[in-house]
UniProtKB/Swiss-Prot annotation:
Compartment(s): Cytoplasm
Pfam families associated with the record: EGF, EGF_CA, hEGF, Olduvai
Family (UniProt): Belongs to the NBPF family.
Protein name per the record: NBPF family member NBPF26
Encoding gene (name): NBPF26
Top-rank taxon, per record: Eukaryota
Leftover remarks: Encoded by one of the numerous copies of NBPF genes clustered in the p36, p12 and q21 region of the chromosome 1.
Region (Disordered): 423-463, 713-734, 782-828, 1242-1280, 1561-1594
Organism: Homo sapiens
Biased composition range(s): Basic and acidic residues: 452-463
Ranges of compositional bias, category Acidic residues: 427-443, 792-801, 812-824
Length: 1673
């Protein structure tokens, strides 16, 4: 052991150093300053250090700004800062809650403020409190002056104040008003026995005993060895009557010869007394400490042993260096600290959930109590009313009766009263109610007999026949029919007491819903009841018992917290020592592990036990949460049932009230019984009205008072004629007997049949619909309820005179006949197996089916407004739905004409047509099911429809597995929409819609469509109903389908990979996902399109004809006719027909040999004036996929032509902007996708309607209409040989060009959006995204720019032939391996390059409205770009002036200047690349431009690796925008923008920004029209000169972090954001960002600016730090 002492000391020293040093040790090296925000790095002796932060900053690196510098906590809350996270939380004072303590709780401490005179109120419980008074005041509420301050009580007594008077509570032995007098106990004889002497002491006395006695009263004999006076193991031996001897143990290592030491003690009466008392006190003091000291000794031994073992191992291993295990120790400490923080956060989260459930349970409990009390009062009132009417049936003077008719009316009134009693009674007394009913019928028949005869027969009737009854509340019971199912409630009534029980048991099911509560009936009593009360209990966990259980659990768990923490600390220390010992033993090869095997196993068992205890604790807390959730669910269900019963009772009481009011106004008043009968009937009406008040909510008291006043007036005027009474009679409720039954919401007011309602449906796994929650309750997540489906929600008001729609049941397997009547605003939603209702109101639903054998659909429709001006014969019939889920039979579909019909099929069932846009979300997550979800909202449609424009809805016939030829539409549709799924034929729909579909298994293909926010204002002339296409297709055989042969107006067609696609007549949006090898699909997405068109007669273009065989790749039969606004998009393996409107889609092909295409276009507004004979001919397409033959391309001229090729086939030209997303995930395929949305273009033409003569047309051509139809480009391309394509030679108007990585790109004539993904080494792609652009331009003559010419070879990277001509609003975007032209308008794209040698970029610009007035001769010339990718030469950059120029480079090409905000997202996933992503949307800019104000764009010169000083801006720009990545310089930007950037490898840094919804409206002098030169000169003199602020200049080198050259000029709202390695200028608008870094050695940051405060958050080595700057206004 002595040899181990030095090693032990070294080991203890190493442990101390490890524990003393920070978990994340800093190193203050030369040239490396880890501390930020002017923090000082202080070095320890061990070489590590820490950051000493200045005031206002905190964190390990001083990276966080002190969040508590400005206390945001309200109402006395305390701000608590978390140094490591840089966040702050508010510790609220009692009575307040919320994130900032902004909400107060309804507690007396904050409502009434009971503590007076500055006292502090403390909450003890929910309703109790305690006041802490200030000095000088006392009392329960600090209402009394503290008299104890001036009157001190002596001798340790307690002073209390009562009513401003003091009182001293004296200790034992003192007396007096202030306890100043000592009581002499020795004056009372008998205290000391056996001759003992009493001595008086202050507050007590003492007995001096004679020799031989001891004790407090000298009442015991003295025995020397009785109390073991010998210590340290000595043995006591009595030597005399009053003496004893101690034999002590031998002393270790003693040199003396004495082996036994004895000590004789002689104890007198003083010494024995004192020794005895000392021994007892020491024994009592030390006895509780013995177990604790033993446990401490065991722990110390264990730690000492582990330390010795570590020291021994370290001593034996001489060559081992402790620096090698430093990283391991740090890693272990980080894991332990992280584990501790996660556990603490989890405990806090669970505690917060428990608190929320407690509050919810208490609130529901209060509401239950109120409802029970209201039911009890209503029960008493109905019983009193029943007794009163029974008295009327047995009058004392039968000769004064009104006759048989009055008796029958009174019997009817009694029957209604009895029905009311049944509504509020249990269900198992129905037999007695039937006996009572028969008995009362007999009374009615025998009412004319003498009273004695009736009394003799009444004796046979049970006494409780009218007071005790039970019914079952069903859907169709009572005067108000209800279509909502609800549970039966059994209530028992006993005499003069409240004793009603609700028995709850738990169903046992095969799924996880074992705690679903079912309410079972309880047999009611049979004894008579004269007083009825009702109290409903919510189950074994509800009520005060649940609150008590919560408090008990809280009190039990609280003391265990400190003990668990201490155990955790001890275990952590042991675990660290064990890991260190194991590591040292592992490094020593010569050490035999068998010697410490038992110790290591023991430590591992302890660690596992700790984890098991933690898991058990978590399971316990989870069980508590689950119980609370079950309790909340049960209370919600019970509340729903009580509200339903209240509603039914209220309806019945209203019916009874109306009946009795009719008795008060008889047709023959002369036959009345007189004033006494009228008074009795008035009393009955008063009781009925009182019943209505008892069963109605508080907010209906005013209505009830009106009815009561009306009854009183009727009693006073009962003798008047009926006509006079009718003249003054008030209007009674019209919905007495015809009131529709709807679902009650939180407010319990009366409802009429036209009010919207909400219904929530819950379905459980592997079961059908088990239960239904009626009413809008609190949205609490319940783990046992898997699916919650809100079925109907609407805020609109229904028009009058609309009958209810009959419900539809879809659970039957056979076909059903559906309604044929006409609906004006009909909605149909299919849900299998639940029921489907067709209602007149919009509603919302969400359905989730998570098992194999369930297929459902949910539809969500809300908040639509439809204003229509209808002509004659515009009634449309609703759709009929016929569907067999498993048998896949052909359904019976629509045969009638619908106005604006909507249809969406799912994968395994046919979809009915609905007459309004709607929204839904559907999820199918198992193998063999396919579903569909549709989402659409906020559509406003204002249309004026002429006569005879009722389009017929399509007919659908499809068998899912057999794929037979369906019977499709043969009639004409107006604005028809069609979308097929992968496995069945798609019906046509007549309005745009939106949906999202997910199919996640091998053998299914589906489709989802999404579209919302479409406003369409159209005026359609007569005879413009286009015929919808006919579809014939077999999925597997790929036969030649029968396509359209007729003319369509605005036809749309989109094929999928495995079936033929029908044509649709309106833009739409969808998203499709196919995740297996042998499937190809298509998804389309389009929303927010506003189109203002006026179409002349006879302009219906013919739709294209399609001929296609999927596998054989034969030559298809393509279009031969002329189309107006034609759109064409091919997929990877089939030819694409032409489309007549922009659309959007997204397709995913995840295997080697498949390609697809997806387009996305939304929010386009186009106002065009078309002349006659301007229908451009559509392109002809000839293509063979595998052989890559030269296709026959366009030879004709097109107006507004758009062309986009895919990587493996030629693309025809399209005439409208569109967008797509393409994904090719294997080595040898390249694709791209485009997306264009929200473009509003309003052109102005010469004349909008009518035909013009030839002379007028010739004159119009002379004025500027000639040569405006630009020819579309010709495309020639071979994929593998990489030949030079034949590109454009002609001039185009509004031309747009986008190349892909492996082929040449044709020019297009409109902005667009795309997203491209290429995931292999040798491919490069491009993605562009643009939406929501509104452009209002006035273009003068001779402004048709010519489109650029493009020549490119991908692999050789030859210098391309770039633009030589001037373009007006030109758009061009290259990929990373080809040259980038300049663009003159904002656009957006998303690009992904995932391999080593490629770099891409992406842009996104949305919702930009630009109002410009362009003068003559303002056509800017587009820049010329010359670039070689690998050689990194100096490119030839812009030399000309551009108006609104936009350009964004990737990591390997030069960045032109930008003139407008844009957004993009870029992903670079390898080691040596950096990227940039920006996002800007919803910017409105109103500008007025003078002549010759086109700002020149900046010139940029950049070499990526060498980081050369670029040539930055020297000119003045008007609202210029530029954003560099981390490896290039950043120009200045003048508008807010947003982006998202992801860098996923070791040595890269990125950032992301997001700014949205900024509206900027400039003010100018004049918006439209020309001004003379004199006026323009005068305007410049008045202050219009020099208003274009120059953008800032930025100069920075990435690695060296030098001081950049910042702004020198004045800016007007300029925005600039650099990455982490260069300086940040000031910004004047708030923005936000999120950054993700996924490796250990990365540094990332996120920015957040709000209210002149800028926060920079940086994450490095699993740490997060922030810094902030406050900007001046």
């Amino acid at each position: 052991m002595p040899a181990l002492r030095p090693a032990l000391l070294w080991a203890l020293l190493a442990l101390w150093l490890c524990w003393a040093a920070p978990a994340h040790a800093l190193q203050c090296r030369d040239g490396y300053e880890p501390c930020v925000n002017k923090g000082m790095c202080v070095t320890y002796h061990s070489g590590t250090g820490y950051c000493k932060c200045p005031e206002g900053f905190l964190g390990e690196y001083c990276q966080h700004r002190d969040p508590c510098e400005k206390n945001r906590c309200q109402n006395g809350g305390t701000c608590v800062a978390q140094a490591m996270l840089g966040k702050a939380t508010c510790r609220c004072a009692s009575g307040f809650t919320g994130e900032d303590c902004q909400y107060s709780t309804p507690h007396p401490c904050f409502v009434s403020r009971p503590c007076l005179n500055g006292g502090t109120c403390h909450m003890l419980s929910r309703d109790t409190y305690e006041c802490t008074c200030q000095v000088g005041f006392t009392g329960k509420e600090c209402q009394w002056t503290d008299a104890c301050l001036s009157h001190l009580c002596a001798n340790g007594s307690t002073c209390t104040t009562v009513a401003n008077q003091f009182s001293c509570k004296c200790l034992t032995g003192f007396t007096g008003q202030k306890c100043e007098t000592d009581v002499n106990e020795c004056d009372i004889p008998g205290h000391c026995q056996h001759g003992g002497t009493c001595l008086n002491l202050p507050g007590s006395y003492q007995c001096q005993c004679l020799q031989g006695f001891t004790g407090q009263y000298c009442d015991r004999l003295y025995v020397p060895c009785a109390h073991s006076p010998c210590v340290n193991g000595g043995t006591c031996r009595q030597t005399g009557d009053f003496t004893f001897e101690c034999n002590c143990l031998p002393v270790p290592d003693s040199t003396s010869s004495a082996t036994n030491v004895s000590m004789v003690v002689s104890a007198g009466h003083w010494s024995s007394e004192k020794a005895e008392m000392n021994i007892l006190e020491i024994n009592e003091t030390l006895r509780p400490q013995l177990p604790e000291n033993k446990q401490q000794l065991r722990n110390l031994k264990e730690k000492c042993f582990l330390t010795q073992l570590a020291g021994f191992l370290a001593n034996r291993q001489k060559k081992y260096k402790y620096e090698e295990c430093k990283d391991l120790i740090k890693f272990m400490l980080r894991n332990e600290r992280q584990f501790k923080e996660e556990k603490l956060a989890e405990q806090l989260k669970q505690a917060e959930e428990l608190r929320q459930y407690k509050v919810l349970v208490h609130s529901q409990e209060r509401e239950l109590t109120q409802l029970k009390e209201k039911l009890r009062e209503g029960r008493d009132a109905s019983r009193s009313l029943n007794e009163h009417l029974q008295a009327l049936l047995t009058p004392d003077e039968p000769d004064k009766s009104q006759g048989q008719d009055l008796q029958e009316q009174l019997a009817e009134g009694c029957r209604l009263a009895q029905h009311l009693v049944q509504k509020l009674s249990p269900e198992n007394d129905e037999d007695e109610d039937e006996d009572v009913q028969v008995e009362e019928d007999e009374k009615v028949l025998e009412s004319s007999a003498p009273r004695e005869v009736q009394k003799t027969e009444e004796s046979k009737v049970p006494e409780d026949s009218l007071e005790e009854c039970a019914i079952t509340c069903s859907n169709s019971h009572g005067p108000c029919d209800s279509n909502q199912p609800h549970k039966n409630i059994k209530i028992t009534f006993e005499e003069d007491e409240v004793n009603s029980t609700l028995v709850v048991d738990r169903e046992s099911s095969h799924d996880e819903c074992q705690d679903a509560l079912n309410i079972l009936p309880v047999p009611g009593p049979t004894s008579s009841a004269t007083n009825v009360s009702m109290v409903v209990s919510a189950g074994p966990l509800s009520g005060e018992k649940a609150a008590i259980n919560i408090l008990e659990i809280n009190e039990k768990l609280r003391p265990q917290l400190a003990e668990k923490k201490q155990q955790f600390r001890n275990l952590k220390e042991k675990c660290f020592l064990t890991q260190l010992a194991g590591f040292l033993a592992n490094q020593q090869n010569k050490y035999k592990y068998e010697e410490c095997k038992d110790l290591i196993k023991s430590m591992l068992r302890n660690e596992r036990q700790f984890k098991e205890e933690k898991l058990a604790e978590q399971l316990k807390q989870a069980e508590e949460l689950r119980q609370y959730k079950v309790l909340v669910h049960a209370q919600e269900r019970e509340l729903t049932q009580l509200r339903e019963k209240l509603r039914e009772g209220r309806d019945a009481s209203r019916s009874l009230n109306e009946h009795l009011q009719a008795l008060l106004t008889p047709d023959e008043p002369d036959k009345s019984q007189g004033q006494d009968l009228q008074e009795q009937l008035a009393e009955g009406c008063r009781l009925a009205q009182h019943l209505v008040q008892k069963l109605s909510p508080e907010n209906d008291n005013d209505d009830d008072e009106d009815v009561q006043v009306e009854v009183a007036e009727k009693v006073q005027k009962s003798s008047a004629p009926r006509e006079m009474q009718k003249a003054e009679e008030k209007e009674v409720p019209e919905d007495s007997l015809e009131e529709c039954a709807i679902t009650c919401s939180n407010s319990h007011g009366p409802y009429d049949c036209n009010q919207p309602h909400r219904k929530t449906k819950i379905t459980f796994e592997e079961d059908k619909v088990d239960s239904t929650l009626i009413g809008s309750s609190s949205h609490v997540e319940w783990e046992d309820a898997v699916h919650i489906i809100p079925e109907n929600e609407s805020d609109d008001e229904e028009e009058e005179e609309k009958g209810p729609v009959s419900p539809r049941n879809l659970q039957e397997s056979e076909e059903e006949e559906v309604p044929q009547e006409s609906w004006d605003e009909g909605y149909s939603t299919l849900s299998i197996p639940p029921e489907m209702l067709a209602s007149y109101k919009s509603y919302s639903s969400t359905f989730h089916s998570l098992e194999e054998q369930q297929v459902c659909m949910a539809v969500d429709i809300g908040r639509h407004r439809w204003d229509q001006v209808k002509k004659e014969d515009h009634e449309a019939t609703g759709p009929r739905l016929s569907r067999e889920l498993l048998d896949e039979k052909g359904p019976e579909v629509l045969q009638d004409s619908l106005d604006r019909c909507y249809s969406t099929p799912s994968g395994c069932l046919e979809l009915t047509d609905s007459c309004q846009p709607y929204r839904s979300a559907f999820y199918v997550l198992e193998q063999q099911r396919v579903g569909l979800a549709v989402d659409m909202d906020e559509i406003e449609k204002y249309q004026e429809v002429e006569e005879d424009q009722d389009p017929s809805c399509p007919r659908l016939s499809g068998e899912l597995l057999d794929e037979k030829e369906p019977e499709v539409l043969q009639e004409s549709l107006d604005r028809c929409y069609s979308t097929p799924s992968g496995c069945l034929e798609l019906t046509d729909s007549c309005q745009p819609y939106r949906s999202a579909f997910y199919i996640l298994e091998q053998q299914r293909v589906g489709l989802a469509v999404d579209m919302d926010e479409i406003e369409k204002y159209q005026e359609v002339e007569e005879d413009q109903d286009p015929s919808c296409p006919r579809l014939s297709g077999e999925l597997l055989d790929e036969k030649e389908p029968e396509v359209l042969q007729e003319s369509l107006d605005r036809c749309y067609s989109t094929p999928s990979g495995c079936l033929e696609l029908t044509d649709s007549c309106q833009p739409y949006r969808s998203a499709f996902y196919i995740l297996e090898q042998q499937r190809v699909g298509l998804a389309v997405d389009m929303d927010e399109i506003e189109k203002y068109q006026e179409v002349e007669e006879d302009q219906d273009p013919s739709c294209p004809r399609l001929s296609r065989e999927l596998l054989d790749e034969k030559e298809p039969e393509v279009l031969q006719d002329s189309l107006g606004r034609c759109y064409s998009t091919p997929s990877g393996y089939l030819e694409l027909p032409d489309l007549g409107q922009p659309y959007s889609s997204a397709v995913y092909s995840l295997e080697e040999q498949y390609l697809g295409l997806a387009l996305d276009v939304d929010r386009i507004k186009k106002d065009q004036e078309e002349e006659e004979d301007q229908g451009p001919p559509c392109p002809r397409l000839s293509r063979e996929l595998l052989e890559v033959v030269e296709p026959e391309v366009l030879q004709d001229s097109l107006d507004r032509c758009y062309s986009t090729p895919s990587s493996c086939l030629e693309q025809p030209d399209s005439c409208q902007p569109y967008g797509s997303s393409f994904y090719a995930l294997e080595e040898k395929h390249v694709g791209f996708s485009l997306d264009v949305g929200e473009i509003e273009k309003k052109g102005k033409g010469k004349k909008r309607r009518g035909r013009r003569s030839k002379k007028e047309r010739r004159r119009g051509r002379k004025e500027g209409e000639e040569d405006q139809n630009p020819p579309c480009p010709r495309l020639s391309r071979e994929l593998l040989d990489e030949k030079g394509p034949e590109v454009l030679q002609d001039s185009l108007d509004r031309c747009y060009s986008t190349p892909s990585g492996c082929l040449e790109l044709t020019d297009s004539c409109q902005p667009y959006r795309s997203a491209f993904y290429i995931l292999e080494q040798q491919r490069v792609g491009l993605a562009v995204d643009m939406d929501e652009i509104e452009k209002y331009q006035e273009v003068e003559e001779d402004q048709d720019p010519s489109c650029p010419r493009l020549s490119r070879e991908l692999l050789e990277v030859v210098e391309p032939e770039v633009l030589q001509d001037s373009l007006d609003r030109c758009y061009s975007t290259p990929s990373s391996c080809l040259e980038q032209p300049d663009s003159c308008q904002p656009y957006g794209s998303s690009f992904y390059a995932l391999e080593e040698k490629h770099v891409g970029f992406s842009l996104d610009v949305g919702e930009i409205e630009k109002y410009q007035e362009v003068e003559e001769d303002q056509d800017p010339s587009c820049p010329r770009l010359s670039r070689e990718l690998l050689d990194e030469k100096e490119p030839e950059v812009l030399q000309d002036s551009l108006g609104r120029c936009y350009s964004t480079p990737s990591g390997y090409l030069e960045l032109p200047d930008l003139g407008q905000p844009y957004s993009s997202a870029v992903y670079s996933l390898e080691e040596q690349y950096l990227g940039l992503a920006l996002d800007v949307d919803r910017i409105k800019k109103d500008q007025e431009e003078e002549e010759d104000q086109g700002p020149p764009c900046p010139r940029l010169s950049r070499e990526l690796l060498e980081v050369v000083e670029p040539e930055v801006l020297q000119d003045s720009l008007d609202r210029c925008y530029s954003t560099p990545s981390s490896c290039l310089e950043q120009p200045d930007s003048c508008q807010p923008y947003g982006s998202s950037f992801y860098a996923l490898e070791e040595k890269h840094v990125g950032f992301s920004l997001d700014v949205g919804e900024i509206e900027k409206k400039g003010k100018g002098k004049k918006r439209r029209g020309r001004r003379s030169k004199k006026e323009r000169r005068r305007g410049r003199k008045e202050g219009e000169e020099d208003q274009n602020p120059p953008c800032p200049r930025l100069n920075s080198m990435l690695m060296e972090v030098e001081e950049p050259e910042v702004l020198q000029d004045s800016l007007d709202i300029c925005y600039s954001t650099p990455s982490m390695y260069f300086e940040l200028p000031d910004s004047f608008q708030h923005y936000r960002s999120v950054f993700y870094s996924f490796e250990e050695e990365h540094i990332s940051f996120a920015l957040y600016v709000d209210n002149r405060f800028f926060t920079l958050t940086v994450t490095s080595l699993h740490l997060v730090f922030q810094m902030g700057v406050i900007f001046p206004q």
